[in-house]
Swiss-Prot record:
Domain Obg: 1-159
Listed name of the protein: GTPase Obg
GO terms under cellular component: cytoplasm
Predominant location: cytoplasm
Origin superkingdom: Bacteria
Gene this protein is translated from: obg
Keywords recorded for this protein, A-Z: Cytoplasm, GTP-binding, Hydrolase, Magnesium, Metal-binding, Nucleotide-binding
Subunit structure comment from the entry: Monomer.
Species of provenance: Methylobacterium nodulans (strain LMG 21967 / CNCM I-2342 / ORS 2060)
PROSITE patterns the record matches: G_OBG, GTP1_OBG, OBG
Residue ranges occupied by any OBG-type G domain in the UniProt entry: 160-327
Family membership noted in the UniProt record: Belongs to the TRAFAC class OBG-HflX-like GTPase superfamily. OBG GTPase family.
Amino acid sequence: MKFLDEAKVYIRSGDGGAGCVSFRREKFIEFGGPDGGDGGRGGDVWAECVEGLNTLIDYRYQQHFKAKKGEHGSGRNRAGAKGADVVLKVPAGTEILAEDRETQIADLTQVGQRVLLARGGNGGFGNAYFTTSTNRAPRHANPGQEGREHWLWLRLKLIADAGLVGLPNAGKSTFLATVTAAKPKIADYPFTTLHPGLGVVRVDAREFVLADIPGLIEGAHEGVGLGDRFLAHVERCRVLLHLVDGTSEDAGAAYQLVRTELDAYGHGLAEKPEIVALSKADILDPETLAAQVARLEEAAGRPPLVLSAATRQGVPEALRALMAAMDAASAEEAKPAEAWQP
């Protein structure tokens, strides 16, 4: 299935049905009076978070969504039927933004959540509504109200327990393929991964979701290399596994570049718990490995893990470190807020 994490859609709720001008006409009833019914309300436009979706690809091929109009009223005080609603089905983690792409309308993170995007127009009153003591036979009715229309942006931020970050070709996709059943594209060139991938990791009878975030480059927070869209997926991750390519010229500089981008993007990315690991250890000679570990330890301020996804060296330790970091984050989130002290 193709992946799409952003889409622009046009929505319009249904117009209300018109009220009816009608008079009661029955045998032996000389002055039947008005009996025009009200128009039906127009259909609404909703967004609903559903299970089984992980992309917005459906909205590449259909961008316009219009709810049905309400039916007109009719004689014998019969009101028109309400117009049919339209429901935009989206995956968990979808943000709905106004046309300016900044004003958040809704953030759907749980299956079953629904939000009303545009309410249908009210139906018009039939002539029976306008009967008064001085006007016993009104000959006018209201038209229905027009529906509302908007252009909206849908933006998907994948929900995962942990995220893999690093420069292009750092071995993130290989790691994901090693520890999960996911089958990402793997090749020996940068930007092999062009969209985020998800996999389920099983460790000691426990499970968590791991996201492979495409490689970040300098200027990613400003949109270089679609980096701002990739960084948006990191927002939902509770813990980060930062992979640094052991074959790079300077592992410390590579680490700092990604940390700079996380900090510049904001949204709390730089404050997330982070596990640092040097990857591709299997193809480094002992002297080079020791030098890269020293550079990375100096840049990160703590000893990094050393791993190789190809040989599984250090992989179990990395997964258990991620699990421990997630447990610590959960314990921190569960702490009650401290009472305010004047």
